[in-house]
Curated annotation (Swiss-Prot):
Gene Ontology molecular function: GTP binding; GTPase activity; translation initiation factor activity
Protein name per the record: Translation initiation factor IF-2
Disordered, as annotated region: 50-407
NCBIfam families: IF-2 (TIGR00487), small_GTP (TIGR00231)
Domain tr-type G: 490-662
Biased composition (Basic and acidic residues): 163-173
PANTHER family: TR-TYPE G DOMAIN-CONTAINING PROTEIN, TRANSLATION INITIATION FACTOR IF-2-RELATED
Protein family membership: Belongs to the TRAFAC class translation factor GTPase superfamily. Classic translation factor GTPase family. IF-2 subfamily.
UniProt entry tagged with the keyword GTP-binding: yes
Cellular compartments annotated: Cytoplasm
Region G4, residue ranges: 603-606
Role: One of the essential components for the initiation of protein synthesis. Protects formylmethionyl-tRNA from spontaneous hydrolysis and promotes its binding to the 30S ribosomal subunits. Also involved in the hydrolysis of GTP during the formation of the 70S ribosomal complex.
Lineage: superkingdom: Bacteria
Length: 999
């Protein structure tokens, strides 16, 4: 294969000096370094054209426009070789035709069908070609050979694939139009044996009749199969094949017209003659393959293979282009010659198939395109749009809007039981929805609602109250069953004392009970719910009243709400000197929500600044209008310390109870009520303060309160005396429970221990399932990001232990309601009732992070304290709730990362700059304000703009002495570490970062 032409070769070819060629290339705008440099083929072609134009010789002919079509059919010429003069003299060239694009010989017929167009003209040119023109054409052919060789394989494959498509949709032959090919020979004369006319390396070309002209033998100068035709005819080499019989001398072969019709889209309307064979007559291949000549043309309907073509300098038998394929079922083409192929050399040019082509082998049709056509963009887009994710049929039933009731934390197995389905099918449905849930795992409410909506069911999550009611119904226990009137007896009223902290609620109860409870309360504030029963003479009768004392501190909101739910009447205590306060309004709202009557006790009227009328005016704004103002609310002025107005208050309570309420309850039957408070006693175990609402509770009864159960071992009143039985509205302390119940849990007595144990176990299981479902939630991207952020936060881990469950609950709620920044978080690992035990210390020490144990009104034993010291666990004790809240809040803020702010120290002006090879530039400065300190942060200002920031004062001296700091008005010398771009007049500003207090 020919390489790129060098400058000296071009100069030798053009007959000029190399420097002339270099100058010409420079004039053309091409950069060439020396005479040995190579030149690309297009540049070489332009160079030759330029020299030809300068010398007056004609350049290679450009393809002229096609001549208009004529009625008479003219043969389509073969390739367009530039005719060279024979040894005997110059030959006449034909009129130039559009040259074929340089490329490899096409191993088959023309890819596309016959295109109607103007016929080719074979008029010979009048001017013979000169020897110089031949040399120019030969050199140009060599230059185009490289590019043509690279495109040869692609062109051949494309032509074969196009031929396969055109075989199907080929139209009836019409007059041959112009097609790229070599220029015709000297004249239109029939081919003769041994003539240089060679078959085109392709199949038959549609034409109306026999072709009359021959083909010049040369395909390019120097037998280049990819070059521009114009080489000189060479004598046939030995072994290249002798003269072939002409089409006229051969007997006619069966043509498509004489054959029975074959099924094809075009229905074979006419004969497709071979090229350049005779009309419809197949032949073994017209024209011998000659050195320098094209391949022999294929035959007709079942024509023979084409002859071998000559190479550029092919030896005997060296084929140029592949021999022309056969006709309708043409034979294979002859071997193609190489660039400098030896005997029989060159690459074999596969014979182009005619209409029908060669037979398909084991690996498909040779040279054909793949059987599966390329899809259009629109078709691929439609297929992509029609794609859908594969769905697996789970077999789960589909609902029609039926309602399914599920408890909190229900599993997929529970759901499957409700709709009579297989739990595995629901697991698969959740998998299709993107949720990984097992059949027995507790699911959140959102997950159950999502699955129900997907299956067509309406899921209703049962509330805790309804859930407990359904649980008791399984044991034939109905808390709301109606009671016959003959079983009802009157019961004492239950009165709850509520109000703001330090307004004298407990002191008022002490005055009523004639006791001193305030002295026993830590900090003088109530932190428990106290239940007492007092007897008051009224209308010559001994009337019993049950009082419930609730805390007034803001942390005990749940306790106040619980007290309002179990009460009949609320006494709202308001201090006459303070007036209405926030917890007063909250207690008022609790009472209204419980729909119970309110009696207002205006306390502390004995103080000098007391103003009872102000209290009445303030409460009027909240809907409590005094009777003296025309309302229906009783206001009583009392003073708890001297005991003023106590009798009037009790009388108002009894009058309200008799006038507004019908207080009756059955005394027979199992006891039912509410656990107001519970705690863990060291000597007596779990102790619960219960208020009986129905029936009678006796010692030895089996009771269940929340998740705790047991048998009543003893009952105590508010004074510590044992009680044999407790009727309605009677508060007692119950001993004998297996665990500490939660404050506010309902209790009931049952016939045997087995029933209460099953109820307690099912309550505990449902609570655990609900807690697990709520803690897990749905795993979404948002929750995942929140968990990742939470892992980066600093957390304060606590273990809460208190004396009663209500206090622990209040402390936990207060801590979670603290307004703390997002950088820190509060985690309560465990909470419980009772003293601090070794288990609490072991739990705290086993945690990966530091855990603090908070003891609220409880202490740790000596052995437990020693273990905590050994394990490094901190224990803190508190007796007042707001003190615990304040210290824990301070600890949370102490975990915050410190924030720093910039504080300016001073400024200095640069008066002189000294160069030093040892330390760099030394700035001679005078301190204008503040002070300069060694190792302080600094920034350099020039004309009011910051030139450099975050610098450090490396050294600081006064005269020759090192200085730690230099104050205002003094001169100094300093260096900025790692920075030397200091100029006279610059300002050095020093600052430091100080920690800012977090709010």
């Amino acid at each position: 294969m020919a390489g790129k032409a060098r400058v000296h070769e071009l100069a030798k070819e053009l007959g000029v000096e190399s420097k002339t060629v270099l100058a010409k290339l420079k004039e053309m705008g091409e950069f060439v370094k020396s005479a040995s440099s190579t030149v690309e083929a297009p540049v070489a072609r332009r160079l030759r054209n330029a020299f030809v134009n300068n010398t007056g010789s004609p350049a290679p002919a450009a393809p002229p426009a096609a001549t208009p079509p004529t009625p008479t059919p003219t043969p389509t010429p073969p390739r367009t070789p530039t005719p060279a003069p024979p040894p005997g003299g110059p030959r006449v060239t034909a009129k130039p035709m559009p040259p074929r694009r340089p490329g490899a010989p096409t191993p088959g017929p023309k890819p596309k069908g016959p295109v109607p167009g103007p016929p080719q003209s074979a008029t010979p040119a009048a001017k013979p070609a000169s020897a110089h023109d031949i040399e120019v054409a030969a050199a140009e052919a060599r230059a185009a050979a490289l590019k043509a060789e690279q495109e040869a394989a692609v062109k051949a494959a494309q032509a074969a694939r196009q031929q396969q498509r055109d075989n199907v949709r080929r139209e009836p032959p019409t007059e041959g139009g112009p097609r790229p090919g070599p220029r015709p020979g000297p004249g239109a004369m029939p081919p003769r044996p041994g003539s240089p006319a060679a078959g085109r390396s392709g199949g038959p070309t549609p034409g109306p009749g026999p072709r009359s002209g021959g083909r010049p033998p040369a395909r390019g100068a120097g037998n280049n199969p990819f070059g521009i035709q114009g080489g000189q005819q060479r004598p046939p080499a030995a072994g290249a094949g002798g003269p072939r019989p002409s089409p006229a001398s051969m007997p006619p072969r069966p043509s498509p017209a004489s054959m029975p019709p074959r099924p094809s889209p075009a229905s074979m309307p006419s004969q497709r003659p071979g090229r350049p064979g005779g009309p419809g007559s197949g032949r073994p291949g017209a024209g011998a393959g000659r050195p320098g000549g094209g391949g022999g043309g294929g035959g007709g309907y079942r024509g023979g293979g084409g002859g071998g073509g000559g190479g550029y300098r092919g030896g005997p038998g060296g084929g140029g282009g592949g021999g022309g394929g056969g006709g309708y079922r043409g034979g294979p083409g002859g071997g193609g010659g190489g660039f400098r192929g030896g005997p029989g050399g060159g690459r074999p040019g596969g014979g182009g198939r005619g209409r029908g082509g060669g037979a398909a082998g084991a690996f498909g049709r040779p040279g054909g395109r793949p059987t599966r056509g390329r899809k259009s963009k629109k078709q691929r887009r439609q297929e992509f749009d029609n794609l859908s994710a594969p769905t697996m049929s789970s077999g789960a039933p589909r609902g029609q809007g039926q309602t399914v009731r599920l408890s909190r934390g229900a599993s997929l197995s529970d759901f499957a039981d409700k709709i009579n389905a297989n739990p595995g099918s629901l697991v698969q449905e959740m998998f299709n929805l993107g949720e990984m849930v097992t059949a027995t795992q507790s699911c959140s409410d959102d997950t159950l609602l999502l699955l129900g909506e997907h299956l067509g069911f309406v899921v209703q999550i049962v509330s805790p109250e309804d859930e407990d009611r359904e649980l008791l119904a399984q044991f034939n226990i109905d808390l709301d069953a109606e009671v016959a009137e003959d079983r009802l007896v009157s019961r004492p009223p239950v009165v709850t004392v509520m109000g703001h902290v330090d307004h004298g609620k407990t002191k008022l109860l002490d005055a009523i009970r004639k006791a001193n409870v305030v002295a026993g309360e830590a900090g003088g504030i109530t932190q428990h719910i106290g239940a007492y029963q007092v007897h008051v003479p009224h209308d010559d009768q001994d009337r019993a009243i049950t009082f419930i004392d609730t805390p007034g501190h803001e942390a005990f909101t749940a306790m106040r709400a619980r007290g309002a739910q179990v009460t009949d009447i609320v006494i709202l205590v308001v201090a006459a000197d303070d007036g209405v306060m926030p917890q007063t309004i909250e207690a008022l709202n609790h009472a209204k929500a419980a729909d119970v009557p309110i009696v207002v006790a205006v306390n502390k009227i004995d103080k000098p600044d007391a103003n009872p009328d102000k209290v009445r005016q303030q409460l009027t704004e909240y809907g409590l209008v005094a009777e003296e103002y025309g309302g229906d609310t009783m206001f009583v002025n009392v003073a708890a310390k001297p005991g003023t107005g106590i009798d009037s208050l009790l009388e108002a309570v009894l009058l309200t109870a008799d006038a507004s309420l019908e207080l009756t309850a059955p005394t027979d039957g199992p006891a039912q009520g509410v656990a107001i408070e519970a705690h863990l006693d060291k000597g007596r175990g779990a102790v619960a303060t219960v208020l009986v609402q129905k029936g009678t509770l006796r010692a030895g009864d089996s009771i269940v309160a929340g998740g705790a159960h047991g048998r009543v071992r003893a009952m105590l009143d508010e004074n510590g005396n044992q009680v044999a039985e407790a009727g309605p509205s009677r508060p007692v302390l119950v001993l004998g429970l297996t665990a500490v119940p939660g404050a506010g849990d309902t209790f009931l007595a049952a016939e045997d221990d087995r029933t209460v144990r099953q109820i307690a176990e099912q309550r505990q299981a449902r609570r655990r399932a609900a807690a697990f479902a709520n803690s897990r939630g749905r795993a979404t991207l948002e929750t995942l990001m929140e968990q990742l952020k939470a892992g980066e936060k600093t957390s304060l881990n606590l273990v809460l232990k208190g004396d009663v469950s209500g206090s622990v609950e209040a402390l936990e709620d207060a801590l979670f309601n603290l307004d703390i920044p997002e950088e820190v978080q509060l985690r309560i690992i465990h909470r419980g009732v009772g003293s601090i035990t070794e288990s609490d210390v072991m739990l705290a020490s086993a945690s990966s992070e530091a855990v603090t144990i908070i003891g609220f009104n409880v202490r740790a034993a000596n052995k437990v304290r020693e273990m905590a010291d050994r394990e490094g666990v901190e224990i803190r004790y508190y007796t007042v709730i707001y003190q615990a809240i304040e210290e824990i809040e301070a600890a949370l803020k102490g975990l915050l990362k410190p924030e720093y702010e910039e504080v300016e120290l001073g400024t200095a002006e640069v008066r002189e700059v000294f160069r030093s090879s040892k330390v760099g530039n030394i700035s001679g400065c005078i301190v204008r304000s503040g002070l300069l300190r060694r190792n302080a942060k600094a920034r350099l200002l020039r004309d009011g703009a910051v030139v450099a920031d975050n610098l450090t004062i490396g050294s600081l001296k006064r005269f020759k002495d090192d200085a730690t700091e230099v104050r205002e008005g003094f001169e100094c010398g300093l260096t900025l570490a790692g920075y030397n771009n200091v100029q006279v007049g610059d300002v050095i500003e020093t600052f430091e970062m100080r920690e800012k207090a977090r709010v």
